[in-house]
Amino acid sequence: SRNRIVAISHEHDLRPFEYICQIPQKKHYTQSIYFRWYDLFYYSTLAAYCSLLERTHHPLEDILEWFYHRYLPEGLGIKGFHINLLRQNVGFNARAEAVANCIEGIFNQYSCYVSKGSVDWDYIQYQSLKEDYRKIPSLIKAKYFYGKGKPFQSLTYLLFSDQSILRHAKVIKEECNCFYDLICQGTMHLDDFADYQSEPIQRLINKGYLYISGDGVLSWTNPYVIRALRDLYHFDFCETAYYSQSSRNLEAIQFLQESDMILLGETLLSEQEGRYFNYYLNTISSSNGPQLRNLYAHGKVYGPKVNHEYNYYVLLRLLVLLTMKIYDELIGITDWKSLIDITRRI
């Protein structure tokens, strides 16, 4: 997953019948079949894992508190972080409320740590922040890169979509899902495609993505550029540090930036991961979510329709994911590879 949250929703996950059935709304978080499946899978998996940890007398709440109260100050020399979770001897409604408060607390504490270099509780107490999880700052410059604009969307759709006009060829040498798979066979010639397909293929050649080799085979001009585009098509964002480890990958990012195909971002969570958090917690970027932070912050948690156990495990999942993203970032900046300011190289 390359430090990505894999459970987030992707627009291209929607099947054609889902596009037909869903009514477009301005602030609507896309919920494909895959997204719903992931939601149920992680709920049941985390519930089972927590039950196992409790039987071994090492509840997940203790592990999370150990990370913030012991590991950060003693292992990384970062002091001041604090969370307060409730144990299994209280009801799920109280436990869910405690986790919701901890998520909001870590949002404020980490934002303060990045901006001021320490967790300043006086500053946090008087700081009024709107909990938009897309905007938690990062210690790493240009942490992510994203596809940019309609030219990027048109290009990646042409290359990687199973609905692309380039998916099929006159001579099918092997069943393929997209144009990318066809070219990767290493046996496709321009004559293998229909006349109506020649114009978009020629456009790909003119833009430097394809070339015709001496024996007439269509090949990728720079496979590293194509792999980066494929990564962006399937996951919507990439972590720049991963691509900075290879000079070929770094050249691919430079090419895409010079082609105005990508833009850079420097937040703890990617734009898509931030929307995932917002979907569950508030109404900042979507209006069709459970709004769990608002639910527990405003005392609207009573009644037969409120499933506190489900809400608790969803909130606990978010706290674990947020903790893992913080851990990955803090470990990353102590690694020699992250000492390079990536923005100077792209």
Model region roles, listed by residue range:
Residues 2-86, 125, 275-346:
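Charge-enriched, short contiguous segments at helix-coil
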